[in-house]
Amino acid sequence: MAEKAGSTFSHLLVPILLLIGWIVGCIIMIYVVFS
C-alpha cells in the first residue's frame, strides 16, 4: 500500500515539476520582454 502511494506520488511529481518549470519560464520570459 505504501509503495503504491509512493509510486503514484513520484508519477505525479514529474508533471507537476514540469508545469511549475514551464510557468516560471513563461514569467521570466515575460519579465525580460517587458522590462
UniProtKB/Swiss-Prot annotation:
InterPro entries: DWORF. The chain crosses the membrane at residues 14-34. Pfam families: DWORF. One of its GO terms (biological process) is positive regulation of calcium ion import into sarcoplasmic reticulum. One of its GO terms (molecular function) is enzyme activator activity. It is found in: Sarcoplasmic reticulum membrane. Keywords: Membrane, Sarcoplasmic reticulum, Transmembrane, Transmembrane helix. One of its GO terms (cellular component) is sarcoplasmic reticulum membrane. It comes from the Eukaryota. It is a single-pass membrane protein. Enhances the activity of ATP2A1/SERCA1 ATPase in sarcoplasmic reticulum by displacing ATP2A1/SERCA1 inhibitors, thereby acting as a key regulator of skeletal muscle activity. Also enhances the activity of the ATP2A2/SERCA2 ATPase. Does not directly stimulate SERCA pump activity. Binds preferentially to the phosphorylated E1 and E2 conformational forms of ATP2A2 which predominate at high Ca(2+) concentrations during the systolic phase of the cardiac cycle. Competes with ATP2A2 inhibitor phospholamban (PLN) for binding to ATP2A2 and displaces PLN. The transmembrane domain is sufficient to compete with phospholamban (PLN) for binding to ATP2A2. Homooligomer. Can also form heterooligomers with other sarcoplasmic/endoplasmic reticulum calcium ATPase (SERCA) regulators ARLN, ERLN, PLN and SLN. Monomer. Interacts with ATP2A1/SERCA1; the interaction results in activation of ATP2A1. Interacts as a monomer with ATP2A2/SERCA2; the interaction results in activation of ATP2A2. This is Sarcoplasmic/endoplasmic reticulum calcium ATPase regulator DWORF. It comes from Homo sapiens (Human).
